[in-house]
Swiss-Prot record:
Its main location: cytoplasm. Cell division factor that enhances FtsZ-ring assembly. Directly interacts with FtsZ and promotes bundling of FtsZ protofilaments, with a reduction in FtsZ GTPase activity. This is Cell division protein ZapD. Belongs to the ZapD family. Interacts with FtsZ. The lineage of its organism: Bacteria, Pseudomonadati, Pseudomonadota, Gammaproteobacteria, Enterobacterales. One of its GO terms (cellular component) is cytoplasm. The keyword Cell cycle applies.
Length: 247
């Protein structure tokens, strides 16, 4: 029985940022019912990391530009004979709506940034053990509030990210589905190829080999070296087949 493992690697800084944002939001939304101190620290640590990422660049501007770029790509696809025009028009409408919603939304993350509880916890997370009850009595009392109260507050925090989530999910879905997986073969654990202006590499490996990829490169060229999970006794086959999509 084969167990495929999917690896994704960004080929530019924009995609790297988007994948990090996606990961952090998934972590925040994974367990929205905060019932324990551990649940709270998991949520607030990821919320703080998300705000750090959002503060580093022009996320909204990059997303709007990408939404427009995807619309242009769909426009060119619409001229191809036999293409599903209904699906193309549906996607173009989704892109336009996401762009309008994102442009009209307040500064991304501002609702979280202005929340007093998030700000207090965020300040203490950099201190080892800094979220004890005597350090953060505000969090301690909040965790003793009714569960429904906490659920409502968490839901409002996540809802404030909806314009970002909607646009990002649409963009990443289009990029991920822009290329098919193709069988490739590495020689002595090494593979290289041209990126052809790709934004994202997606690799599928069989878990049975217990190998993982170490990827370097950019949109025009990339290299992949396969390494064994067991660095001492693991073996890399002379010829190793895997699946690759350059998106």
């Amino acid at each position: 029985m084969h167990t495929p493992v999917l690896f994704e690697h960004p080929l530019n800084e924009k995609m790297r940022t988007w994948l990090r944002i996606e990961f952090l939001i998934q972590q925040m939304a994974f367990h929205p019912m905060i019932a324990t101190h551990a649940d709270a620290l998991h949520f607030f640590r990821n919320a703080g990391d998300l705000l750090d990422v959002l503060e580093r660049g022009e996320v909204r501007t990059d997303l709007v530009k990408e939404l427009e770029r995807q619309q242009r790509k769909l426009q060119s696809w619409a001229e191809v004979p036999g293409v599903d025009q209904e699906r193309i028009n549906e996607l173009r409408q989704q892109l336009k709506q996401s762009s309008s919603t994102l442009m009209a939304a307040p500064r991304i993350g501002q609702f979280l940034r202005e929340d007093r509880l998030i700000a207090l916890v965020r300040q203490r997370l950099s201190i080892p053990g800094g979220c004890c009850s005597f350090d953060l009595p505000t969090l301690h009392i909040w965790l003793h509030m009714p569960q429904a109260h906490r659920d409502e507050q968490v839901a409002s925090w996540l809802a404030s990210l909806d314009p970002l989530i909607q646009s990002l999910n649409l963009i990443l879905d289009l990029i991920r589905n822009s290329a098919l997986f193709r069988k490739q073969t590495s020689l002595n654990g090494f593979y290289q190829d041209n990126g052809e202006d790709a934004d994202l590499l997606r690799l599928r490996l069989d878990l049975a080999h217990q190998l993982y990829p170490q990827i370097s490169g950019h949109k025009s060229r990339f290299a992949i070296r396969f390494l064994p999970l067991d660095s001492e006794y693991g073996i890399v086959p002379e010829r190793f087949d895997f699946e690759l999509a350059c998106c």
